[in-house]
Structure formats: C-alpha cells, structure tokens
C-alpha cells in the first residue's frame, strides 16, 4: 500500500488534480482510498458525483464516539473509498487536529485494508503547521507530491512545503516524489517548473495543461475520465497517474533560500 500526500497552495487545483489522478488509477484497476484533509471538504466530490459527504468531525459531533466505518466512508467512481476529515466550527479549534482525529479513527475502524494499492491524502498546503503535517509527520504518507504552477505564490508555497518535507524526512522516512504542474498558462511555465523541481533535487512528474474540459466535467460533478474518457485531457491525467505509479525517484528536497527562489523567478521572466 502506497500512501501519498498531495500538497499545494489553496486554489491551485489540488483536489481536482488528486481526484482526476485517482480516477485514472481506478480506471487502471487500482484499489484506492482518498482521505480529504481540507476543511472545505471538497476532496472527494467529483468521485462521489457531487454527494456532499458528511465529514468525520461532523459525524463525531453528531453521533458521539459510537461510529461505524460506513458512517464516514462512501464508495465513489471506480470503487474508490472516500473520506472527508472536515474541520472545526469556524473560529473554534484547529483544523489540523481534525486530520489527526480522522486518521486515528479510520485506523481504529479498520479502513486501511490490505487490498488497498493506494491511500491519497489531499492536504491544505499553504501552511505546514503541525496538524496539516500530520500525514507526513506520523509516517503515514511516505510520498509527497506538490501541485504548483508558474505563478510566484504557488512556487513560494511549494518551496515552503519542501521545507516541511525536509524536516520530517530526516526523522520519518517521508520523501518528495515530484512536482505536478497544474498549468495557469504563465509564460515559460514548463521551463520554470522543470528548473524549480531540479533545484529542489526532484523532478517535474507531469505538466498538466490548462483545459476548460476540467471545469466542464466539474460542473457535471465528475472527473474528466468519468465525464468524457476520450478527451485529450483525460489522457493527461492517465499519464500523470502512470508517472506516479511507476515513479522511483524519491528525494529529501533541498529547499531554496528566498534569494535563490527570486533569482530563479527572475531568470524565467516571472519577476522583474
């Protein structure tokens, strides 16, 4: 069972990328569980065709400790198992704690079955605070992929996340598997992301081009592979899934200093 955490700044398309990749892996016959670790609880919506799944934290609040696995785990596209951690009530408590609570509950309820090929954690990634680092800190997820684009803030966030991965790699055995570019059609984006990944000592695992088909599928509450499997964009996610499935390059990243990151951005025309 490979346990993978997907990080990236808010709004970068992390949940969309994760679900489309999971759909491609499921199409290829893989058994997968997706654990949403974002208070927005939108990490499984496309796999569940828009079903607004009740989160682990909401279920705990409503039902108390007496919970069955089927109360929090729903089956989605390609027999994927879908769980949403959820978050605390706004202004009260720490969302990171919710992730810790959820993963512990899933373990105690026997969600991590031996037939699973993959567990994906879709994690809010602007902040690598203790709770959001839970999937990597506790040694659950061994592989990290960071979703980024050629935009400055996406790369700042990706570099910061790399610092968190580096910190836990030395103690926990977690490794960076690569950078996923979710394109924003920025000038020189492919070259910049390739150079950025190389600078970290990693690789660009795939460049996902921007395509309105992704939004069209989302409006229909589906992944692209589910909505229109013959689309070229569906093949992009299949390629990404294959690259992750066959990946053997796992590194302790070497995050950049602020100055070096800005040099890189300037060299590729992102900063003046």
Swiss-Prot record:
<keyword id="KW-0013">ADP-ribosylation</keyword>
<feature type="binding site">
    <location>
        <position position="129"/>
    </location>
    <ligand>
        <name>[4Fe-4S] cluster</name>
    </ligand>
</feature>
<dbReference type="InterPro" id="IPR027417">
    <property type="entry name" value="P-loop_NTPase"/>
</dbReference>
<feature type="binding site">
    <location>
        <begin position="8"/>
        <end position="15"/>
    </location>
    <ligand>
        <name>ATP</name>
    </ligand>
</feature>
<keyword id="KW-0004">4Fe-4S</keyword>
<keyword id="KW-0535">Nitrogen fixation</keyword>
<dbReference type="GO" id="GO:0005524">
    <property type="term" value="F:ATP binding"/>
</dbReference>
<dbReference type="InterPro" id="IPR005977">
    <property type="entry name" value="Nitrogenase_Fe_NifH"/>
</dbReference>
<dbReference type="GO" id="GO:0016163">
    <property type="term" value="F:nitrogenase activity"/>
</dbReference>
<keyword id="KW-0067">ATP-binding</keyword>
<dbReference type="GO" id="GO:0046872">
    <property type="term" value="F:metal ion binding"/>
</dbReference>
<feature type="binding site">
    <location>
        <position position="94"/>
    </location>
    <ligand>
        <name>[4Fe-4S] cluster</name>
    </ligand>
</feature>
<keyword id="KW-0479">Metal-binding</keyword>
<dbReference type="GO" id="GO:0009399">
    <property type="term" value="P:nitrogen fixation"/>
</dbReference>
<keyword id="KW-0408">Iron</keyword>
<comment type="function">
    <text>The key enzymatic reactions in nitrogen fixation are catalyzed by the nitrogenase complex, which has 2 components: the iron protein and the molybdenum-iron protein.</text>
</comment>
<keyword id="KW-0411">Iron-sulfur</keyword>
<dbReference type="InterPro" id="IPR000392">
    <property type="entry name" value="NifH/frxC"/>
</dbReference>
<dbReference type="InterPro" id="IPR030655">
    <property type="entry name" value="NifH/chlL_CS"/>
</dbReference>
<dbReference type="Pfam" id="PF00142">
    <property type="entry name" value="Fer4_NifH"/>
</dbReference>
<dbReference type="GO" id="GO:0051539">
    <property type="term" value="F:4 iron, 4 sulfur cluster binding"/>
</dbReference>
<feature type="modified residue" description="ADP-ribosylarginine; by dinitrogenase reductase ADP-ribosyltransferase">
    <location>
        <position position="97"/>
    </location>
</feature>
<comment type="similarity">
    <text>Belongs to the NifH/BchL/ChlL family.</text>
</comment>
<comment type="subunit">
    <text>Homodimer.</text>
</comment>
<keyword id="KW-0547">Nucleotide-binding</keyword>
<protein>
    <recommendedName>
        <fullName>Nitrogenase iron protein</fullName>
        <ecNumber>1.18.6.1</ecNumber>
    </recommendedName>
</protein>
<keyword id="KW-0560">Oxidoreductase</keyword>
């Amino acid at each position: 069972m490979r346990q993978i955490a997907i990080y990236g700044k808010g709004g970068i398309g992390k949940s969309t990328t994760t679900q489309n990749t999971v759909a491609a892996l499921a199409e290829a016959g893989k058994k997968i569980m997706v654990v949403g670790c974002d208070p927005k609880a939108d990490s499984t919506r496309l796999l569940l065709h828009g079903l607004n799944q009740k989160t682990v934290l909401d279920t705990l609040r409503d039902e108390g400790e007496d919970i069955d696995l089927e109360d929090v785990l729903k089956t989605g596209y390609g027999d994927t198992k879908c769980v949403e951690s959820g978050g605390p009530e706004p202004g009260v408590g720490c969302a990171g704690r919710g992730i810790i609570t959820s993963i512990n509950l899933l373990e105690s309820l026997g969600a991590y079955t031996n037939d699973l090929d993959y567990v994906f954690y879709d994690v809010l990634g602007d902040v690598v605070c203790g709770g959001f680092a839970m999937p990597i800190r506790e040694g659950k997820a061994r592989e990290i992929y960071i979703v980024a684009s050629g935009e400055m803030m996406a790369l700042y966030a990706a570099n910061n996340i790399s610092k968190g991965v580096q910190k836990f790699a030395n103690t926990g055995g977690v490794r960076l598997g690569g950078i996923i570019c979710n394109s924003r059609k920025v000038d020189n984006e492919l070259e910049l992301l390739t150079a950025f990944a190389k600078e970290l000592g990693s690789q660009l695992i795939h460049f996902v081009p921007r395509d309105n088909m992704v939004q069209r599928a989302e409006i229909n509450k589906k992944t692209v592979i589910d909505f229109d499997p013959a689309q070229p964009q569906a093949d992009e996610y299949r390629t990404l899934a294959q690259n992750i499935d066959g990946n053997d390059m796992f590194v302790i990243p070497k995050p950049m200093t602020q100055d070096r990151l800005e040099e890189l951005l300037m060299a590729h025309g992102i900063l003046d």
